[in-house]
Amino acid sequence: MLFSRPGRSIFPLLPPYGAHDPNGGRRIIPLNPDGITPYLGLRSRLSQVWLNRWTILLLLVLARVLIAVAGMQSDMGSAKREALSACTSVESMGSAMVSMPHYLSQGVNELTAAGVEKAVSALKTMLLLTITGVEELILFFIKVMYQTYLCLFTMVVRGSVHLALGVVEDAADFLNSTVKSIGQDIHKSVDSFESSLNSFIDDINGIASALLGEIPKLDISDKLDKLDSLSLPSSIDSTIDKVNNSIPTFDEVDKYVTNILRTPFEEVKRLVNGSLSNYTFDRSALPVPAKEQLSFCDGSDGINSFFDKVAHITTTARTIFIAVLIIAAVLVCVPVGWQEIRRWRTMKERSQLVHKDAHDPMDVVYIVSRPYTAATGVKAASRFSNSRRQILVRWVIAYATSPPALFVLCLALAGLFSCLCQYILLKAVERTVPELTSEVGQFAGKVVDKLQDTSAKWAADANSAIADTNTDLNKNIFGWVNTSTTAVNDTLDAFVEKTTGVLNDTFGDTVLSGPVQEVYDCLIGLKVEAVQKALTWVHDHAHIDFPLLPNDTFSRGAADSISDGSSNPSDSFLADADDQTSNKITEVVFRVTDKIEEGIRTETVISAVILLVWVVNALIGVLRALSLFWSRERTRGEGGGGAPMPAAPADSHGFVDVPLTAIPDVASHSQPAPRYEGPAPALAVSRDIPYGDEKLGSVGQKALHVDGISDLRGSSYVEYGMEKR
């Protein structure tokens, strides 16, 4: 389409000097006689190489990194102060913890002493019950053994005595009755004989009394009366009764034997009651640890070395970033300078396109001003055969790489690169955090070690007191058991050995040796062996051992809280209830790193959003190009391409109207502009452009004015005159 515009000055689009050739030939713009040009030459361009966008962006990245390093150093300084403060708190808490045995031991000592006293009381009760039980069992066993024989013995003895007493009584009664009967019979016979004899004597006395005198009479009545009263003495019965009464009864024997057997057991009970009734554990024998004071924060190499290392890392990183980015900013000037040289040369080469009538002037200006993006578009457009699509591809690339778009892209990339540098610095710092965690673990380990030492020392002293109690009780209570069982076992061994020797000497060479040995084993040997086993068991188990206190009585909980097997890290005695980390000191560092990480994340999101803006802008261009890419090209009647214009020679002032057609210049050997086929050639219409002379300072040059209608090409896909894209 053709548009008319009022006359206007084309200065400074074209230089006033040498702007026309009076001979009407091709224009050759000479240099100023002094070599000065209104545009920048090569040396001027090279003098501004250090102001290229990449150097500036790298310097901006360096500035952001330096700000981040300074912020990290400030945050780490605050973190160091907080960590030292937390360390002091931990130190105070650790001192309180290692002093806890001083307070806890008093209660534990009382608990231990009370436990020993209760155990001794229970031991006394158990011993009394055991002794009573053993006493009754032994009595039962002995009674079973001796009462059988005692019953038989008592029966035999008492039966014999009763039998003898009955015989004596019967004999006495018989003798007494027989003697009296005989005496009476004798008395009767003697009385009869005496009566007869006395009668005879009386007769004799009557005859011979005159001659011989009187013969005495026989009188034995008194003697016979003694015979009537003859009987066995009663002392015989009393003696037998005395013997009978002197034989003990079974109840008396049982009571006597029982008293004999109970005597040692009752004595043992008396000893046990006397030793254990009022037993009191010596509480003064249990130790009380002294208070402890820890000091591992003053001059602590752990925290100071960690933050010194972090400061060294940040300083080193700052130095590295300064060196690398400055070197990169300086080195980038080299390719940029070379780029400027090539761009200058390319501009000089492509500036000749202005004199050619085969190219669009705006395209030429774009190619000259943006050589690299234009070259990229040309290369991408070369994949298409249709000139319309080639132009659309070049337009998309030009749209996506316009100065505003490239500014947004470079800003986003610079922001992402800055975030990357900060991320590298953050990771370098985070790699040192385990060292601090390890050092803090050593703090906890120091507390636990101190607790373990205190607990072990206390346990050793307390266990020594308990061991002394064991020794005392075993000696005073069970010492006689060991001595007596050993003596009885030795006695039984001697008895068995002696008895076996006698049996072997007596029946060793006879056929009765085996039976006698079997009878001995059955009656005596097995019972003696069982008694020896029982005595051995009593000897081995008749002692007391109170359980000892473990060495980690006061340190087990603290040690478990920092062990690797702890299920909940917040159980650590260095952790507060609200902390998410294992202790307060590392939580300070993690808070700083989390803050820095959050800042990096925010900057990354901002840079990504800026990059997304560039992507959206590029997508807009792509979508616009695609809408034209697949649409039908309009004809001239539909508002498409303009009418063909014949070519016109140069006017009298030496200006040549440049046709806006895309006719390739096959005669040109320099082809910096794209070579793609365009529509059919059309002749351009030339119009004379009058201008007037005008003084320009002392040089005397004339300004050039253009009146009338400018020659512009209308296109179905690009209208350069309307700046439509």
UniProtKB/Swiss-Prot annotation:
Superkingdom field: Eukaryota
Biological role stated in the UniProt entry: Involved in cell fusion during mating by stabilizing the plasma membrane fusion event.
UniProt topological domain (Cytoplasmic) ranges: 75-136, 340-394, 624-725
The keyword Cell inner membrane is annotated on this UniProt entry: no
Keyword Protease: no
Phylogenetic placement of the source organism: Eukaryota, Fungi, Dikarya, Ascomycota, Pezizomycotina
Keywords: Cell membrane, Conjugation, Glycoprotein, Membrane, Transmembrane, Transmembrane helix
Glycan-carrying positions: N176, N244, N273, N278, N482, N489, N504, N551
Intracellular or extracellular location(s): Cell membrane
A single BP term in Gene Ontology: plasma membrane fusion involved in cytogamy
Residue numbers on the Extracellular membrane side: 1-53, 158-318, 418-602
InterPro entries recorded: PRM1 (IPR026777)
Gene that encodes the chain: prm1
Membrane topology label: Multi-pass membrane protein
Primary localization: membrane
Name of the molecule in the record: Plasma membrane fusion protein prm1
GO cellular component, one term: mating projection tip
Species in which this protein is naturally found: Aspergillus terreus (strain NIH 2624 / FGSC A1156)
Family statement: Belongs to the PRM1 family.
Ranges that cross the membrane: 54-74, 137-157, 319-339, 395-417, 603-623
